[in-house]
């Protein structure tokens, strides 16, 4: 299955998707273009599936993907394990988001089409978790 390039290099695309996925987990919904929303949905579904597993390996995999801007410098400058605090996004994923979908097998997110953006007529969408 292919993916969308979103007119970016690999590193820019990876950073964009990480940021949008983290914002979706922290805020519960994001407003972005349709193409970005469809790509973020794929990553968010994978993160929620990891959250449902709930073991240490899944937590570590989620921590490598999700980003927490405030703690990123602390992690880089950490000298021992006690200095590394668990990211807020990872905590939210495993304690709030994943338990909501314990009995659901996929389809954790929903995309609403919002119409076109005023400046460049890009198709916009609202990506949110299913209740």
Swiss-Prot record:
GO terms for cellular component: cytosolic large ribosomal subunit. Keywords: Ribonucleoprotein, Ribosomal protein. It comes from Oenococcus oeni (strain ATCC BAA-331 / PSU-1). GO terms for molecular function: structural constituent of ribosome. This is Large ribosomal subunit protein bL17. It holds the Pfam family Ribosomal_L17. Part of the 50S ribosomal subunit. Contacts protein L32. The keyword rRNA processing does not apply. Belongs to the bacterial ribosomal protein bL17 family. The keyword Cell membrane does not apply. InterPro entries: Ribosomal_bL17 (IPR000456), Ribosomal_bL17_CS (IPR047859), Ribosomal_bL17_sf (IPR036373). One of its GO terms (biological process) is translation.
């Amino acid at each position: 299955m292919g993916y969308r390039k979103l007119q970016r290099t690999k590193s820019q695309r990876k950073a964009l998707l990480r940021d949008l996925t983290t914002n979706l987990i922290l805020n519960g919904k994001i407003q972005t273009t349709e193409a970005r929303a469809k790509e973020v949905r794929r990553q968010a579904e994978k993160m929620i599936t990891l959250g449902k597993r709930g073991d240490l390996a899944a937590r570590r995999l989620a921590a490598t993907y999700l980003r927490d801007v405030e703690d990123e410098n602390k992690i880089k400058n950490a000298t021992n394990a006690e200095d590394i605090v668990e990211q807020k996004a990872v905590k939210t994923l495993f304690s709030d988001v994943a338990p909501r979908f314990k009995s659901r097998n996929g389809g954790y997110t929903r995309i609403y089409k919002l119409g076109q953006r005023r400046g460049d007529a890009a198709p916009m969408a609202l990506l949110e978790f299913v209740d």
